[in-house]
Swiss-Prot record:
UniProt comment concerning the protein's domains: Inhibitory activity is regulated via a pH-induced conformational change of the structure. At pH above 7, Gfh1 is in an inactive flipped orientation that prevents binding to RNAP. At lower pH, Gfh1 switches to an active orientation, which enables binding to RNAP and inhibitory activity.
A GO molecular-function annotation: metal ion binding
Function: Inhibits all catalytic activities of RNA polymerase (RNAP) by partially occluding its substrate-binding site and preventing NTP binding.
GO BP term, pick one: regulation of DNA-templated transcription elongation
One Pfam assignment: GreA_GreB_N
Assembly and interaction partners: Interacts with RNAP.
Keyword tags: Coiled coil, Metal-binding, Transcription, Transcription regulation, Zinc
Coiled coil: 1-74
InterPro entries per record: GreA/GreB_C_sf, TF_GreA/GreB_CS, Tscrpt_elong_fac_GreA/B_C, Tscrpt_elong_fac_GreA/B_fam, Tscrpt_elong_fac_GreA/B_N, Tscrpt_elong_fac_GreA/B_N_sf
Transmembrane segments: none
Family per record: Belongs to the GreA/GreB family.
Protein name as it appears in the record: Transcription inhibitor protein Gfh1
Binding residue positions for Zn(2+): 20, 24
Length: 156
């Protein structure tokens, strides 16, 4: 049996939107490829080869998204008492007062550019957060080095 992929509801919806965009891109790439094939006298044309490669990349991305979504299990919102998959966690550096907001998600949803930053439960930081409660102080490896943070709030 294929392994399930745990996703938040928002993550599932985001991947569905990506799949729809990729399907639209595939239609456009197929159209361009057909036009190039019809107008090309030489099948070794580099433009034709590039179009074939782009179409193959899009098809691979669609296959990947369809695979993830077919195995998806949407997480129920947590109690907010203990950090788990899907939890949005507010952290505070006790020394500087700096605050950091992260959401613990599955690797399929991880994206450090999102706000809040979506970190994988399989990452060192994600693993360190799981199971903690408000008030707990934990040591995390961050891009700025090892730092201590206090769990200020847990949502979901």
């Amino acid at each position: 049996m294929a392994r399930e992929v745990k996703l938040t509801k928002a993550g599932y919806e985001r991947l569905m939107q990506q799949l729809e965009r990729e399907r639209e891109r595939l239609q456009e790439a197929t159209k361009i490829l057909q036009e190039l094939m019809e107008s090309s006298d030489d099948y070794d044309d580099s433009g034709l080869e590039a179009a074939k490669q782009e179409k193959a990349r899009i098809e691979a991305r669609i296959d990947s998204l369809e695979d993830i979504l077919s195995r998806a299990v949407i997480l129920e919102e947590g109690s907010g008492e203990v950090i788990g998959l899907g939890s949005v966690v507010e952290l505070e550096d006790p020394l500087s007062g700096e605050r950091l907001s992260v959401q613990v998600v599955s690797p399929a949803e991880a994206n450090v550019l999102d706000t809040p930053m979506k970190i994988s439960d399989a990452s060192p930081m994600g693993k360190a957060l799981l199971g903690h409660r408000v008030g707990d102080v934990l040591s995390l490896d961050t891009p700025k080095g090892r730092r201590e943070f206090r769990v200020v709030a847990i949502h979901g």
